[in-house]
Amino acid sequence: GPSNLGSSTQRHPIRPISEIGELEANRRARWALNLDDPFSSRIYFDLNRKADGKWAVEKVTLPPVVEEGKVPPRAIFVDALGITDSFLNAALKQEFDDAKSVVDPEKVSDAKIAGLCIIFEEAKYQLRNQKPLRAMFSSETTAGFKANVEDETGERAAEFGLTVQREDSTQPWRVTEVNLDQLLTDYATRIAGGDVHFTPLVKNPAGGDTLILYFGFDENGLTPRTERQLDIVASLLKTDPSKKLTLSGHTDALGSDDYNKGLSKNRAIAVKEYLLSVGVPLTQMIAQAEGEAKPRLPNVLEDGEDNPSGRRANRRTEIYLDF
């Protein structure tokens, strides 16, 4: 077993062996022996469950030899599981570029990738040790996985679905769907005290996904939470100078129209100035003030009572990534 390895081989101190995921439900799985660097230096074992229920090694894959000055490959494996695992590990480390390199950009938006990075960073999710990626279905051109994540304590678990597809066996696998519904519900319970509207990712009525940053009542200052989210947005924008985003500031319905218009303008400007400070040029940003004209949720309930939860969801700056 791994314990017989010579002391010259440094193993990852936390988990010398980690499960990558299932290649086929309950029949084939991939594990890794972690060397000195937990992600880039690994020996992989593909295991096959025999008729008697015992597992046998089907294939061993050594880490690639990278010449000095050369960049190591982003994904060691280009099969369905390998691409899914690469995508998740990139998102967990907020490496937007690497995550984007393995998606079908027509099916998975930049906003969704950034939203996933934000959720992972803020809720401190990590892939679960046991069955991190369950194989749900697979064919020659489509495979579905269930990703199992947990918080740092291991006490709270959440899951979400991913689909990868390819045109045929000569084409690369790409992530084509990331279903975050269950993950966003868990995130809202943990981070937002159960307020499901307090989520960084929503559907844009015009199509696609929109990132949302929230503000407290009557304020336009950025919280550390918002600044961390903007750092991820900035890294996304720096990947391509031709990308533009529209910052649209919003308020709730308390206060006069003129006051709210000014407040929403200040909210959009606060976001714009922060992005400028971390190196995003002005040419990539358009700021708009909407005031209270476009609420996400009702400010007042049907019986005329105040709706604080709705007003909270309406105090926001929306970031439309118009790529």
Residue spans of the language-model regions?
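Periplasmic OmpA-like peptidoglycan-binding domain that tethers envelope proteins to the cell wall
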Residues: 251-323
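Periplasmic peptidoglycan-binding/tethering modules of Gram-negative envelope proteins
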Residues: 149-159, 165-244
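Extracytoplasmic
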Residues: 26-28, 40-42, 140-144, 157-159, ...
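Short, low-complexity N-terminal intrinsically disordered segments enriched in polar/charged residues
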Residues: 56-89
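Soluble periplasmic/extracytoplasmic beta-strand elements of cell-envelope proteins
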Residues: 46, 56-60, 146, 161-163, ...
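Surface-exposed, charged secondary-structure patches
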Residues: 3-50, 61-64, 111-161
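Solvent-exposed, polar/charged alpha-helical surfaces in well-ordered, non-transmembrane soluble domains
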Residues: 81-89, 97, 101, 228-235, ...
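Short, well-ordered alpha-helical segments enriched in acidic and aromatic residues
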Residues: 1-4, 90-112
